[in-house]
Amino acid sequence: MQNDGTFDPEASYDAVLVGAGIMSATLAALLHELDPQLRLLLVERLEAPALESSAAVNNAGTGHAANCELNYTPMQPNGRVATDKAVAINAAFERSLEFWGSLLERGRLTSTDFLHRAAHISAVWSPANIAFLRQRFEQLKDIPAFAEMRWTEDRQDLAEWMPLVMEGRDPNQAVAATRIERGTDVDFGALTRAYLLPLQSSGALTVQYGTEVSNLKRLRRPNMTEGDWRVITKGPSGRREVRAPFVFLGAGGGALPLLQRSGIPEGDDFAGFPVSGLWLVCNDADLAEQQRAKVYGKAAVGAPPMSVPHLDTRWMDGRRSLLFGPFAGFSSKFLKQGSLLDLPASVRPTNLLPMLQVGATNIELVRYLINQLRQTPDQRFDALRDFLPTARQDDWSLSVAGQRVQIIKRSKEGGRLQLGTEVVAASDGSLAALLGASPGASTAVTIMLEVLQRCFPERLASADWQARLKALLPSFYSDPKSDPDVLKGMRERSDGLLGLSR
């Protein structure tokens, strides 16, 4: 507000995006490509972008394409694995690659430093898990997206694929693995910063760091633009009011409290269940250089998706790193740099019963988290030694990962713990929030396209936006899941533009 009590037009934007992580940055990039005249405001409570779940060390998994993450293909009672989710996630990641390739082609991204080749391997070593992996392989290899998947139980192949995993292992232990060579690691923190820089330089995007949204309210007075949101922020310069016809809540775990404050009825169905994580990080750079793949195992019964054990080659701050985990834990914070009061403050009359029902019907998850919380450093290291038999404790240190807030959703059948992500949008499309976790960042482009479809349907149906989308995402009006030729064309284009074919 201005000193005379009137509203400052300069504090009016076409869209306000909350949270400077990969989701808001992706949406900002998409909106700018579709309409370069839009005035966008990004608000971030921390002092820089991508410091929460988008940061490399905080992300539970990077480069998700369902190549090796076994929790995306659960075993069914009929003895076959479900493949629909894996196919959908793979197609979503291909869409992300397609988008990055277009931005690089247009000069919006100036390098591919955020993207690295890393083979994706699934590895197991118990008879039951080997049988599961074999069934998974037999089904996936016939699907075009996974046609290049290889299987082996040969010790020489295994030693070539994952030398650290096989070194020092009992020669009598049965081990099986699948491998897809065309895998990647993505530094989503670096990508977030790469998205934001040209948008800020062009003047299309204003970013306010150290600024928190304290409240948001719908304006419907006659002298206001119908439906504008009044967003109250607190930052270095004090309290400020901004207005916009569209608000996106992409603040990770912080999105749920803001969704509740918005007052839209669509938010009444949701609660959050926070899960924290820990990594063992390798301090030996030479050892990290020997691991050229992401190696995923199989999660324990009842474990949440972010706790699938894996030995992860990951680029952090421009250099190759090696992580193992994540180990699950519990904290009532919704953000790594949040408050212990986040969970209790989110309880409402509409979500209390669903939360209690989820606790009562997910005993295995509760038991798993309790056991994880009770783990000693030696027990965590024993889990690492199961993957790396020759690991030395002095080479590894404990690091805190990011917070994940799993969705609890009210339904006719009661409260349900919902894994994955969900876009919650106001009925008129004026506000959208992203809740949940995994696979998250890797599928950000597809998720933000859903936001556009639900919140900008008329503009998305216009000839202008359709032409722009077709140029930006040549396969947008095709389906790579059902058309192998479309998938092949997408991959050839993306690999060429992004340098993944080398």
Curated annotation (Swiss-Prot):
Catalytic reactions of this protein: (S)-malate + a quinone = a quinol + oxaloacetate
Pathway(s) served: Carbohydrate metabolism; tricarboxylic acid cycle; oxaloacetate from (S)-malate (quinone route): step 1/1
Alphabetically ordered keywords of this record: FAD, Flavoprotein, Oxidoreductase, Tricarboxylic acid cycle
Cofactor or coenzyme needed: FAD
Domain of life: Bacteria
GO molecular function: 2-hydroxyglutarate dehydrogenase activity; L-malate dehydrogenase (quinone) activity
Protein name listed in UniProt: Probable malate:quinone oxidoreductase
